[in-house]
């Protein structure tokens, strides 16, 4: 789902001016949408109540009061983006020049302070990110006076184009926001074929819902920033100035009722000054406003037309009108969504930002030549062809009525929200907006749009008062954060119990045993040796290790395991995900299982712990409190030492609760800080930047070291990606291509598999598994945990060594286990659990596909080559040709 708001810069008003001109002209001729009319408290204060004119929309974008012409927001003058060029080619040329002349620092190339400043500006631009740019004047000076070359050598015609705009300035303000409120498809279908009276009632109901949503945003989401003792603080403003534009169809010509609300980015604070709105506060309340709109719309349409609704999709907040909720019918009239999904699949992208980009990339002009009468006649015919005629449409408008929530329903809803599957199911804290959002999706249809809002807000206040505990406040945004007593009590009890075990004296290894192990492994670094000493000698019931990316923590855990076992302890290994247990197995842990399996075995008494047991949990920072707490309870009752290993700054917990972080703050942790994975210093710094949240700096480092390739055409990108994969494959580097979307993964797998088959690397016999076919020699990835029965985990890479087509089994050799293992996969495992392994889905937030040789995956040397233009994709080459960063 796309984010229901878009920031609009100065200069983007042409679309809205077109809306004004066309809508006014075509509305009265029966061909266009209804004209936009002013809404909001700010508009009312300014006396703006009628239709918006083109001049008034221009005033909105120019930061003026549309009524008086008074200047509200001052221009933010910046160099025209068209007068800038990418800094990366210039920096690369400067580095080459410095290498030729034996100069250590790039500014030393300059013959004057001014030119040295230009050099530093290029360096700063690259550090700002891969899209860093510099003024064309800087390019011209450095090219001619430092590099002694014509700037066209580096930039070609792009230099001439930028030179034409040198010295120009533009207003870089965000002038307005476009809030889009969309109705469910069944509402659009009812409007398409329901007749004039139904359409009037639908329009009135949607207008009521819009009033509810905008009113909520005005009270809770609109404000300005003001300095308070040297830091920004949120302050409320007097309301919004908006212009809604109603639309009845999508760009694909389908029925699609939605409203674009143009909101001026200006607010007057209590001090009387006009400034830009606090966008962070606005975004914090957007989803609640969007789902309140849908709840209010359901109430209004039930009140006006008697429609009844399906259950609400908790993810989208939408419900469909009963009788128009058939999935096939909805998909038949959703061509626009299909266009966006196809574009995302082709580009290999996903997520909110990608969906917004897809909406823009696939945008086509609406057909404005068709009259309103003709449009509705066409839709009526199409609905009839789909089996929805006049009788069916009349049948959905029956005696449906909203109602207030009953006491029993309310208690059940509050209990659910405050329980493990409620607001803290996947996050440890929440805000008032989160509560309103959740209630808008859970409460029954209200008697009216206004009561839908009142009901949600009142119940939210009760929930916060009776079922929540305030745990913090964002002073700048003025937003309180809450948690549930249930989760806090679990975390509090867990930390208290672990604290009481600090002097328990369990799991202690004799000093001479520890020394023997460390002497055997003289390559252990000081931080690794100190960690082994600490966890084996402390005697604490719960010990923690925080290992930075590339610090060799799993290998160091193997040393600790060796010491414990040498002194007679039974060591068990566990991890939140199956593939992480494989890493423990590679380091000598003979008894490993997932945390879910471990908890199940303990609860069903299939596994017993005692004082001579040691439990090592890798990637423990990924565990939510509700899984970590019972695990520690079992260990405490048995007197078992627990070693939790992870990095709370590298991986967030999968479930709610920062249990690992809370324990680390109270108990402390051994730290593994030395990056042993990356070889070059700049790479180590880049990884540290990622860990510290400075992603832009990390990307800038890759750009500065020429690790980023840009493609304008997706096919060119994919060809380069496969070429890199093939080169690494021929070099026996066992490469894997990573991509975001399943469709792109499947396409790349097909290409790679066909390439190997054409070169005679695959067997002739094929085993069909679903819609896939496998041959001997194929690389596969296993998709399910079967540690006990087969000894394989979800995510295990393997190569097919034999097929038994009649019995539908395959034999595979694992590729990343040390040593490799041969496993026969039975029929029950194959279906849906074995997929081609040349390409896999990428779950980390990288911008596109990546080709990673085995050495790169194991050592972290894997280069992202991002393409920030239309492709938004990346590829990488072999570490033999380039060293590269770790993905964490």
Predicted regions and their residues:
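Intrinsically disordered, flexible peripheral segments
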Residues: 1-418, 423-427, 431-440, 455-457, ...
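Conserved nucleotide-binding/hydrolysis micro-motifs of P-loop NTPases
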Residues: 9-14, 185-188, 248-250, 267-269, ...
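Interdomain "pre-motor" coupling segment immediately N-terminal to P-loop NTPase/helicase cores
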Residues: 441, 445, 450-513
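N-terminal pre-P-loop "Q-motif" helix
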Residues: 521-539
């Amino acid at each position: 789902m796309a984010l229901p708001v878009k920031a609009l810069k100065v200069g983007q008003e042409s679309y809205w001016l077109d809306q004004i001109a066309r809508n006014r002209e075509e509305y009265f001729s029966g061909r266009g949408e209804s004209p936009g009319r002013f809404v909001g408290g700010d508009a009312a204060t300014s006396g703006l109540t009628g239709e918006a004119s083109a001049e008034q929309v221009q005033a909105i974008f120019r930061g003026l009061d549309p009524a008086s012409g008074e200047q509200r927001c001052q221009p933010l003058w910046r160099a025209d983006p068209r007068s800038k060029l990418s800094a990366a080619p210039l920096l690369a040329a400067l580095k080459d020049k410095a290498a030729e002349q034996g100069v250590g620092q790039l500014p030393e190339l300059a013959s004057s302070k001014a030119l040295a400043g230009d050099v530093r500006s290029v360096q700063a631009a690259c550090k700002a990110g891969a899209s860093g740019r510099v003024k064309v004047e800087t390019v011209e000076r450095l090219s001619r006076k430092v590099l002694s070359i014509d700037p066209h050598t580096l930039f070609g015609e792009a230099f001439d184009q930028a030179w034409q705009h040198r010295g120009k300035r533009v207003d870089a303000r965000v002038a307005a926001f476009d809030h889009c409120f969309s109705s469910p498809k069944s509402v659009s279908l009812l409007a398409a074929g329901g007749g004039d009276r139904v359409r009037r009632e639908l329009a009135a109901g949607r207008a009521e819902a819009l009033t509810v949503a905008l009113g909520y945003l005005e009270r809770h989401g609109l404000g300005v920033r003001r300095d308070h003792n040297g830091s920004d603080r949120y302050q409320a403003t007097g309301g919004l100035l908006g212009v809604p534009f109603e639309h009845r169809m999508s760009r694909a010509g389908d029925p699609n009722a939605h409203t674009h609300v143009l909101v001026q980015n200006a607010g007057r604070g209590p001090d009387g000054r006009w400034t830009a709105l606090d966008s962070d506060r606005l975004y914090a309340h957007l989803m609640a406003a969007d789902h309140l709109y849908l709840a209010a719309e359901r109430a209004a349409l039930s009140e006006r037309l008697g429609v009844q609704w399906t259950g609400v999709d908790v993810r989208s907040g939408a419900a469909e009108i009963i009788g128009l909720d058939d999935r096939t019918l909805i998909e038949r009239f959703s061509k626009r969504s299909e266009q966006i999904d196809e574009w995302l699949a082709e580009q290999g992208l996903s997520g909110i930002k990608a969906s917004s980009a897809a909406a823009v990339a696939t945008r086509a002009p609406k057909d404005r030549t068709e009259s309103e009468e003709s449009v509705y006649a066409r839709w009526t015919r199409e609905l009839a062809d789909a089996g929805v005629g006049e009788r069916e449409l009349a049948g959905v408008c029956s005696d449906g009525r909203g109602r207030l929530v009953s006491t029993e329903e309310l208690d059940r809803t509050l209990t659910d929200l405050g329980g493990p599957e409620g607001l803290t199911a996947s996050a440890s804290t929440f805000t008032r907006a989160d509560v309103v959002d959740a209630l808008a999706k859970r409460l029954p249809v209200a008697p009216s749009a206004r009561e839908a809002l009142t009901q949600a807000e009142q119940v939210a206040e009760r929930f916060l008062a009776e079922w929540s505990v305030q745990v913090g406040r964002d002073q700048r945004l003025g937003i309180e954060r809450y948690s549930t007593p249930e989760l806090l009590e679990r975390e509090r009890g867990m930390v208290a119990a672990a604290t009481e075990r600090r002097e328990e004296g369990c799991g202690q290894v004799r000093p001479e045993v520890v020394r023997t192990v460390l002497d055997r492994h003289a390559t252990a670094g000081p931080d690794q040796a100190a960690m082994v000493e600490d966890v084996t000698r402390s005697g604490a019931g719960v010990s923690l290790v925080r290992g930075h990316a590339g610090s060799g923590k799993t290998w160091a855990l193997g040393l600790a395991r060796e010491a414990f076992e040498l002194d007679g302890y039974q060591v068990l290994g566990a991890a939140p995900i199956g593939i992480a247990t494989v890493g423990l197995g590679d380091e000598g842990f003979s008894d490993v299982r997932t945390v879910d399996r471990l908890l199940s075995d303990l609860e069903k008494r299939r596994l017993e712990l005692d004082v001579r047991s040691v439990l090592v949990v890798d990637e423990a920072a990924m565990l939510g409190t509700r899984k970590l707490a019972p695990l520690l309870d079992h260990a405490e009752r048995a007197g078992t030492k627990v070693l939790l290993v992870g990095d709370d700054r590298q991986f967030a917990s999968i479930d709610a609760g920062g249990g690992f972080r809370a324990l680390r703050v109270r108990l402390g942790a051994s730290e593994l800080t030395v990056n042993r994975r990356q070889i070059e210093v700049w790479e180590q710094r880049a990884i540290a930047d990622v860990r510290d949240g400075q992603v832009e700096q990390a990307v800038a480092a890759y750009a500065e070291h020429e690790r980023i390739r840009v493609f304008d055409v997706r096919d060119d990108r994919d060809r380069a990606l496969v070429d890199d994969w093939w080169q690494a494959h021929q070099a026996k580097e066992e490469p894997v291509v990573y991509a975001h979307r399943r469709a792109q993964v499947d396409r790349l797998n097909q290409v790679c598999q066909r390439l190997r088959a054409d070169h005679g690397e695959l067997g002739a016999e094929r085993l069909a598994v679903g819609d896939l076919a496998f041959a001997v020699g194929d690389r596969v990835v296993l998709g399910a945990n079967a540690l006990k029965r087969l000894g394989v985990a979800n995510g295990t890479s393997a190569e097919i060594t034999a097929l038994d087509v009649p019995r539908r089994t395959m034999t595979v050799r694992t590729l990343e286990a040390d040593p490799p293992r041969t496993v026969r996969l039975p029929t029950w495992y194959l279906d849906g659990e074995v997929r081609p392994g040349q390409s896999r889905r990428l779950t980390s937030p990288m911008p596109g596909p990546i080709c990673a040789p085995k050495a790169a995956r194991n050592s972290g040397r894997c280069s992202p080559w991002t393409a920030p233009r239309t492709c938004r994709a990346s590829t990488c080459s072999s570490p033999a040709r380039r060293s590269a960063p770790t993905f964490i």
